[in-house]
Amino acid sequence: MTTIMVATMIGLLLLGFPMMIPLATASIIGFFMMFGGLGQMETLIQQLMAGIRPASLIAVPMFILAADIMTRGQSANRLINMVMAFIGHIKGGLAVSTAASCTLFGAVSGSTQATVVAVGSPLRPRMLKAGYSDSFSLALIINSSDIAFLIPPSIGMIIYGIISGTSIGELFIAGIGPGLMILVMFAIYCVIYAIVRGVPTEPKASWGERFSAVRLALWPLGFPVIIIGGIYGGIFSPTEAAAACVLYAVLLEFVVFRSLKISDIYAIAKSTGLITAVVFILVAVGNSFSWIISFAQIPQAILEAVGINEAGPTGVLIAICVAFFVACMFVDPIVVILVLTPVFAPAIEATGLDPVLVGILITLQVAIGSATPPFGCDIFTAIAIFKRPYLDVIKGTPPFIFMLVLAAALLILFPQIALFLRDLAFR
């Protein structure tokens, strides 16, 4: 049964069908092979509905909507200008500012695609003008945007939390340390790159310009305060924090900044609705697929066949990293989380691994795979936005992928990088 389901998925993917079709088809085939007919079909429908029933999923369209509003408004530019005012003048400062701006906007929006658009669109031309190569600029924007997978809010963490039953609030807090560690790695590389290539520095901003930039960015900086402060302080659940972010974004862009008009609402709602529909369909069919393979005890059979259960906690973590990394090079990250998390669930439980640490590692691997050739989804986002050839986009990615893999190794060796803030906040 496993072979037929996997072959069906691969075959339909190669034929160019959207990911939801192979998942749904494989689920139906597996269901028929287990139950032998339509008699229990209502069970499959129930599993489809169960996938999108959790109230926590409401946070997904909320964060998507907030990100769309901010991308179309002034929040992103104000954050970029503030970062540039303080570190733009150092060696490699423009590149470091790009990485920091991606991280900061990721902490505001939770969306890698929104971050690529909001930060990459204004900063890539400035980087090219300053003397950075296009391949380096594109790779930096893509990989820095993927830090949004780790810095809360993170849609990937929400999906993992629902599938695994892990606290989304704990995942959000635990992602901060690894996200900042990766930002530091990228910043060091940017400085070294600028020194080696002889990239000139930007003019230094005066303290008056810095204070002005901070003043203008104070309102957008309220987003991470609402999310992290609200969850940490027990004021909001993650879902309530998402709703508060939407309200805050509407007030900022429509009332305070007046950067958007009533006529923009239709385009924003349409964009949010389309993205949300795709995510929810994937979650629904992914849940039915996960239920079928779990019911058939396929995960246990796979893990026993490859001997992962005897590998110990470190071996299980390495296997998880490799599986998620490779899968995300070819398949949408949400689908990978939905399909592979149940596969490794028995091994995670058997070895007593902290599900929060596992969630952070999975999220990191999703980030790496999404920016890795041949089919990482963020590569094609950059191709669509910047209108550059495929080879130009991927040429500068290897150093960043190496740093992300190094970050994963450090997390396995030193789990407190992720768990320290979690323990401080919740234990």
Swiss-Prot record:
Residue ranges spanning the membrane: these are: 13-35, 49-69, 79-99, 103-123, 147-167, 172-192, 216-236, 237-257, 273-293, 320-340, 356-376, 400-420
| Top-level taxon of origin | Bacteria
Quote the Pfam families the UniProt record gives.
Answer: DctM
Give the observed phenotype of the deletion mutant: Deletion abolishes accumulation of ectoine from the medium.
Keywords carried by this UniProt record: Cell inner membrane, Cell membrane, Membrane, Transmembrane, Transmembrane helix, Transport
Record keywords: Cell inner membrane included?
Answer: yes
Name the family: Belongs to the TRAP transporter large permease family.
What is the protein name for this chain?
Answer: Ectoine TRAP transporter large permease protein TeaC
The organism of origin for this protein: Halomonas elongata (strain ATCC 33173 / DSM 2581 / NBRC 15536 / NCIMB 2198 / 1H9)
Gene (UniProt): teaC
